[in-house]
Every structure is written in C-alpha cells, then in structure tokens.
C-alpha cells in the first residue's frame, strides 16, 4: 500500500488512548472515532490521547455509518465490550460496509465455540462484502502464540495448563461488571456462577441460543486447539468468586467493594481432546489489593515439561500493541470472520504499517 493505513477507532476509553497513539507511531492515521458517551462526542482525539489536536473529532454512534462512508477507513478498531453480542452491531456495520475490523472483545478471539450463530452471521456478511473481521489482544501472544511456540519445541505433550491474572481496574466498567466485581457472594452465585452448573447438552443449547457467557479462557482453549490441530471432545467451565479480607475501593466501579464481597472471579476451563491432550486454563480477573500484580504462567507437560512465567506484564500496552501489529495481517487476510491463528504468527512491525499490506 502506497499510502498510510486509515483507521477508525470504535470506543474511545482507556484502551483507545494507547491504540490511537500506537497507530500514529506505526505510520498509520486515525481518520475517525466513534463513541456513545456524550462527554467525549465532539472532542478531538488529540485531547483524548493527551496530545495536540488532530482535527479528527469523536462522532456519535448515531452518525457512525455516515462518517464511515465518508472517511472510508481500511480498518476499524473496536474496543468497547467483552462479549460478542455487545460488539455485534459494530462488527456487522463494518461487515455491511466492507470495512475490515479488529476487536479487543475477548470472546471475539475465537467466538465459533461460544456464539457460532452470530459469528456465522458476521462471517457471511464479511465474505459478501470482501472484508475481514477478527479478534486480538493480549491473548494473541500470551495465551496463544507463546504456548504454541513452546509446544513446537516439545516431543510429546500430555497436558497444557495455564493461569493468568489481571486487574479489572485497568479495563473499564464493562469488564469489571462481567467479572462480578462488587457483587455479594449470593449475587455472584446467582448472576455469574450458576450459569455453569449445567449439563453439556444444556450448555450446548445455551451456546446455540447466543446467550452463553464464556470466560476468556473458553475462547482461548478453542483457539489453542485450532492452532495445534486438536479435536475438541468436551469442554467445561467453572467460575468461583475471588474475595478480599479488607474493603477495597474500585475507581472503575466508583464504589468500595466490601470485605468478603466478590472482587472478581476465577474461571477454569478444561478441554479434553480426541488426541488425548488436555488443556486446563484459569483466568483470574479482580480488583487488586495493594500487594497484588499481574502474572501469566503456562506449563506444557510431556517430554519435557516446560513452564513459562511472565510477571507484571504491561497488559494494557501489550493488548493495544498486539492489535496494532495485527492490522496488516487483517487487511491481508481472506474475507470472512477469520480468527488470528489462521493469519500466521504475530510479528513486530518495524516499518510503517502500510508497507506490510499486500
């Protein structure tokens, strides 16, 4: 491509501050931004990034389609919510207009195993209009490529076990609420945990209905199996609340989470495969106490056993860096809903983004 990659930012919250700056620093340009928050509509994106004004202002969602038709971006970066159902309209709008899209929506990383009908709806429309839709973020490397790379150096694998923790304070209110932060244990049990006390048949019915609430690792395990060529035999999910012995104030929730109430949750996903390899992954998302920090640890068991630990990863920056480095891959990919394990490894882009676009 002999011009700058044109990007529209969908959602201008905490993540967008980094993503938009990274796009400019990688030689792209943000030509539009969309939000529903009346406090940011009309604001210059430079102000949102803490930089000089750019002349590009935030458009309201009501005017999004018209703006997209006018600026004709190469790709939209959708950074709003955590469930496919909640970003569906944004992704379908992109697919309808033939605009590529990449989203940090965690379910979108591999939504075929949690909301196949909506995924197919997006897939069909994207194919019809010649664009690619995908999900990426922190998990693309740290719950995905890092593990499959270790697997590539292993003679025999019997089990893969992973655990990752993160502070829900860093990602905004949608994510915090999705983790049950601030709920009493009774509310958590009713609103979050009870959804997983069901049979495999019932779970499949909920998945087909589009109402399943997957933890992040649910989609990650599906991605790993696809990348490693494994056939899923069964997959289960259990969610348990995390608590603290002292009150913790959450700036994201705008309230104090009382001692003994849920600060978030741990979700454990277990996948059995036809090939005999088990994948067990745990995701811990909560409002951190003062002495807690992010940690990502995975072990590939077999011949030999290998453990990799990433302590205190800058998860927000790594999420946004992954998305921006993926942009050329998305533009180059075949049309449809194409998950990133089919795009090849995520690589560092040393040159301007457009130089990687075929």
Please describe what each predicted stretch is.
Residues 106-130:
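Rossmann-fold NAD(P)-binding glycine/threonine-rich loop
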Residues 127-156:
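Short alpha-helices
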């Amino acid at each position: 491509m002999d011009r700058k990659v044109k990007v529209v930012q969908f959602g201008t919250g905490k993540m967008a501050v980094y993503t938009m700056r990274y796009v400019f620093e990688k030689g792209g340009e943000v030509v539009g931004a969309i939000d529903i928050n009346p406090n940011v509509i009309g604001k210059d994106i430079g102000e949102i990034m803490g930089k000089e004004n750019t002349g590009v202002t935030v458009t309201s969602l009501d005017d999004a389609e018209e703006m997209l038709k006018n600026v004709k971006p190469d790709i939209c970066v959708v950074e709003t919510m955590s469930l496919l159902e909640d970003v569906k309209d944004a992704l379908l709008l992109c697919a309808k207009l033939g605009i590529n899209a990449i989203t940090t929506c965690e379910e979108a990383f591999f939504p075929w195993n949690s909301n196949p009908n909506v995924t197919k709806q997006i897939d069909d429309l994207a194919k019809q209009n010649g664009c690619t839709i995908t999900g990426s973020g922190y998990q693309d490397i740290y719950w995905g490529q890092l593990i499959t790379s270790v697997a590539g150096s292993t003679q025999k694998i019997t089990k893969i076990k992973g655990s990752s923790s993160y502070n829900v304070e860093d990602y905004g209110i949608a994510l915090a609420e999705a983790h049950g932060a601030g709920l009493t244990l009774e509310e958590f049990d009713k609103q979050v945990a009870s959804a997983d006390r069901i049979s495999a048949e019932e779970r499949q019915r909920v998945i087909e209905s589009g109402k399943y609430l997957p933890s992040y690792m649910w989609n990650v395990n599906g991605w790993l199996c696809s990348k490693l060529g494994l056939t899923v035999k069964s997959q289960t999910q259990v969610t348990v609340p995390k608590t603290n012995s002292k009150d913790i104030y959450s700036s994201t929730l705008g309230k104090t989470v009382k001692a003994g109430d849920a600060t978030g949750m741990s979700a454990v996903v277990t996948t059995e495969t036809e090939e005999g390899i088990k994948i067990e992954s745990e995701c811990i998302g909560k409002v951190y106490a003062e002495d807690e920090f992010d940690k990502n640890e995975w072990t590939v068991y077999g011949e030999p056993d290998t453990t990799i630990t990433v302590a205190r990863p800058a998860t927000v920056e790594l999420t946004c860096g992954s998305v921006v480095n993926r942009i050329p891959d998305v533009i180059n990919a075949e049309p449809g809903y194409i998950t990133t394990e089919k795009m090849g490894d995520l690589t560092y882009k040393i040159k301007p983004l457009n130089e990687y676009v075929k």
